């Protein structure tokens, strides 16, 4: 059952190592024990539903699977990302100039999703309440 390494048995630089294998097995075990894949599917569906419920005209499309979510906007995402970071302490990614990328940890809860939705709504509402003005000031 146990793997017994001996001198000369491993001979590649990039072939892996015992510590790396043990770390990977531990991660897989935690993912199973904490049901992280199930959480990603369930909370991911909830996340997308909450995003769609925002109903903002600035949101062109919401796409994703599990917790890998993209929100395509009709404006550049940089002002929203800056406000999320500096006002709400939430870091987001981006793709191109108009897609906000959301990649939270697999253990995220519905409560944390609700916190993000409230923060995003605040940022979007701040932009929508200034029609006709340059958005560079955000």
Regions found by a protein language model. Give the residues of each.
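Conserved N-terminal phosphate-binding loop of PLP-dependent enzymes in the Aspartate aminotransferase
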Residues: 1-138
